[in-house]
Design a protein with these regions (language model features):
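Alpha/beta-hydrolase fold nucleophile elbow
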Residues: 236-248
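C-terminal catalytic histidine-bearing segment of alpha/beta-hydrolase fold enzymes
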Residues: 343-407
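N-terminal cap/lid segment of alpha/beta-hydrolase-fold proteins
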Residues: 84, 88-136
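Glycine-rich nucleophile elbow surrounding the catalytic serine of serine-hydrolase chemistry
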Residues: 246-256
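N-terminal pre-domain segments of enzymes
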Residues: 22-83, 381-384, 392-394, 398-400
Length: 407
């Protein structure tokens, strides 16, 4: 190409850029996804994806008209679907038994650090807090942290801004054996973050797992499952009184393990409950660059998840085992959970709470549907979520645990 042609091409590109920069873009005019075609078809790939998402009907959705027999059959379908999409492997070579790395006496409890070997080429860790003088065998709680948190935050070994989030430490002080894990990509499972002094990168590893047909949740729930199996083998733990407690991100592996393993006794769900498919459909308001929000990061992606269910369906399938939900959501979704427990014959086994800001019914959004075109903040407000007060609700959980674990 001659210099003249290169110069001409450069001028054209500059002119095009100038025209684009002079275009006035008003995000509020494009909050919802629309088409101007009379046949209702979309040219935009985003529009096509949204159309497909709206027309995706989960095959394992809970039906409030289930009979008790139908409910039991539905629970099996949910379990089969979870097993299918989590893709938990069966190692071809038997792995070594977990190994205790340390044992240290603390104020009122003993802290142990263990490592285990869930896969070839893989080692992971967990911590155990054993209250002094505890009667054995005793109930135990498997504690799963939220995003950016670690096992050491849960055990109180690393400083934490809100001490109520030191879930495992607080469980041990209450007299329960507590087992704490790291989520995949965080804590001991991090890459270079501790050296570089940066926040945890969940997305890169999640992308690699997805490329191999797995997922972040499939992997982290598989690791947690190995810890759960270890707990069942310990003489100090009552195998019929194991509780799973998840904070924020940790509620996702909690749901997976709860469905997979009917022997788990009870569940602490410390996050707001939502229809994740609906969240993706309604959060469409673009930013000033014309970028629409994605409802959650890549670590939350599980291929084919929405073909089967949404979060409330999964929690409903845990009935009749005791569950407490501590941070609200729409009353619509809580009502679905309560209905599932009614069908199971044990309505007393579910306890639900809203954020204090939305504790009064007249402060909550009573609607059963949400409008499209929402920003993230607008969505949170409409589903009765108070993000600044997202923390582990010890004041609600401890009395509940005492009640359900009382002999």
């Amino acid at each position: 190409m001659t210099i003249k042609k290169l110069a001409a091409a450069g001028i054209c590109m500059m002119q095009a850029a100038l025209v684009f920069s002079q275009t006035t873009f008003n995000p509020d005019e494009h909050r919802t996804v629309t088409t101007n075609r009379t046949d209702g078809r979309f040219m935009s790939t985003y529009g096509v994806a949204q159309y497909m998402l709206k027309h995706t009907k989960p095959t394992c959705a809970f039906n409030p008209t289930f009979s008790k027999k139908q409910f039991a059959a539905w629970q099996k379908r949910v379990r089969d679907a979870i097993n299918d999409i989590m893709c938990h492997p069966t190692p071809s070579v038997k792995q070594p038994q977990p190994k205790r790395l340390s044992s240290e006496q603390k104020d009122g409890y003993r802290l142990e650090k263990w490592e285990f070997y869930p896969l070839e080429g893989c080692v992971a860790t967990f911590a155990v807090l054993i209250p002094d003088g505890i009667k054995q065998p005793s109930p135990a709680v498997l504690c799963i942290p939220g995003s950016g948190m670690t096992m050491d935050h849960l055990t109180g070994e690393r400083p934490i801004a809100n001490k109520r989030n030191a879930m495992a430490l607080n469980m041990a002080r209450q007299g329960y054996i507590a087992v704490a894990v790291d989520n995949a990509c965080a804590g001991d499972a991090a890459d270079l973050e501790h050296i570089a002094g940066t926040g945890y990168d969940y997305d890169t590893s999640s992308r690699l797992l997805l490329e191999m047909g797995w997922s972040w949740l499939g992997y982290t729930s598989y690791l947690d499952k190995q810890v759960l199996e270890w707990m069942k083998q310990q003489k100090m733990i009552r195998h019929d009184r194991i509780v799973l407690s998840g904070f924020s991100l940790g509620t996702e592996p909690l749901m997976v393990l709860g469905v997979m393993d009917p022997s788990i006794y009870a569940f602490v769900y410390n996050d707001f409950l939502c229809q994740t498919q609906e969240r993706a459909i309604v959060m469409t308001a673009p930013d000033k660059r014309g970028r629409r929000p994605f409802p959650n990061s890549i670590r939350h992606l599980i291929p084919r998840f929405w073909h089967y269910f949404n979060f409330p369906d999964i929690v409903a399938s845990l009935a009749p085992r005791p569950v407490i939900l501590t941070e609200g959501g729409l009353d619509r979704d809580f009502q679905l959970i309560h209905r599932a427990y009614e069908i199971s014959g044990h309505p007393e086994n579910v306890e639900t709470h809203h954020y204090p800001k939305f504790a009064s019914p007249d402060k909550r959004n009573p609607n059963t549907t949400l409008p499209e075109g929402l920003t993230r903040d607008e969505y949170f407000n409409l589903v009765n979520v108070d993000p600044p007060n997202h923390y582990f609700k010890t004041d609600l959980v401890m009395p509940w645990l005492e009640r359900i674990l009382k002999e």
